[in-house]
Amino acid sequence: MNARPLSVAVIGAGPAGIYASDILSKSGLDVSIDLFERLPAPYGLVRYGVAPDHPRIKQIIVALYKILQRGDIRLIGNVEVGRDVSVAELREHYDALVFSTGADTDAPLDIPGVDAPECYGGADFVSWYDGHPDHPRTWDLSAKEVAVIGVGNVGLDIARILAKHAEDLMVTEVPANVAEILRTNQATDVHVFGRRGPAQVKFTPLELRELGKQPDVNVLVDEEDFEYDEGSQAALAASNQQRQVVKALEGYAMAEPEDLTASHRIHIHLFSAPHEVLTDEDGHVRALRTERTRLTGDGTVTGTGVYRDWPVQAVYRAVGYASTPVKGLPFDSENHVLPNAGGRVLGEDGEPITGVYATGWVRRGPVGLIGSTKSDAQETITNLVADAQAGLLHADTDDASQVGHDAVTVLLTRRGVPFTTWQGWELLDAYERQLGQDYGEVVVTSGQSKGRERVKVVSREAMTELPRSEERRVGKECR
């Protein structure tokens, strides 16, 4: 083993990267850990992928905060690997690299017309309303009737945000630009489409039940969409969660007409496969054409040749997330992951690249929640520790002074990269919370007055400059 601590860079400061760093720090190795993040703020999809009206899920940040607050894991934010520093350079400065860059782009949907201007990626919309600094500040919400393709929780999030009254989102952490545009939202009817049946939808029961609790929003499901074959029955028998989902869907389907008086509606359509986005003579969305499907016996479906056109003026794709390639590493473009075995990244020859690892969605694809992320990180770090104990991990340099945090931050400073730190994030976090307090009370649809926990800062420049300015101010006061 080296006389100096093992130096490890973890790339990606979402849950996967933070949990991997935490597990490594407690592994018993003498280790120095730097956690890189391409955005100025940590937490990944918990900050930029969870709907703003889901503070319960955002409580995960409390656990992640406690890990980073300890100080034994150093955050280096606003640094993009492949742009500000290369993989090859990181391998010179660290004994091992762990990639946890996640999956934050939309999986493709290959149907005619999907490139129309009012066809949007669900991940892009989520990034917009969550204040991602690399996404546009504006969004067209003029459509009164909207289609959402995909029956997972992201599809429900999109439908709920579009159907919800703007004032009920003003109490969340949405940025100022998002709040302003949400007030112009014209959507009254949001149609959610899934190609299979109730036994196959990917909603979780809690998310689905929550959909029906939105003020002045009705959820409608067609009674004809409840069909089950042998495969469906087996799926329901094996999963209590799926039985709860079906029960919730049946509850919506059995609602009495006199109770469906809300001004906004979410329609869930099953056995409806997207076939084509129809446009008018100017190329703008006018309808979504779907094909009715039927079960084949094993839970899969086939088309029936029966089509229906749904008048909509916008279409959102929510058919899954995909990882993006890491410049300088092999990439499995079919599965959208870094090729790996047990978290060890594989080269073009199929052999492990010594000292390079992957964890989280970039390792296994966009499936699983926090529990899966933790077990995934555990396996990857276990293999990293084994490789370290076998003496396999060494930085690509013989100069010990070029290994680790100080050498990398000198390199970034020399290049003019305005990287952020954990201390800087705490200053920005406090600033956002103060913006929430300063906003005051908001009257929501129910008539209640509520305060705001925070208001997100969106601009990358502001996110990097605000904490630096505050650090300079505090420094002057301490002189």
What is each stretch, according to the model?
Residues V8-L29, I158-L162:
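N-terminal Rossmann-like FAD-binding beta1-loop-alpha1 element of flavoenzymes
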Residues V345-R473:
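C-terminal, flexible cofactor-proximal segment of oxidoreductases
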Residues P40-A96, Q244-S263, H267:
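N-terminal Rossmann-like dinucleotide/flavin-binding domain of flavoprotein oxidoreductases
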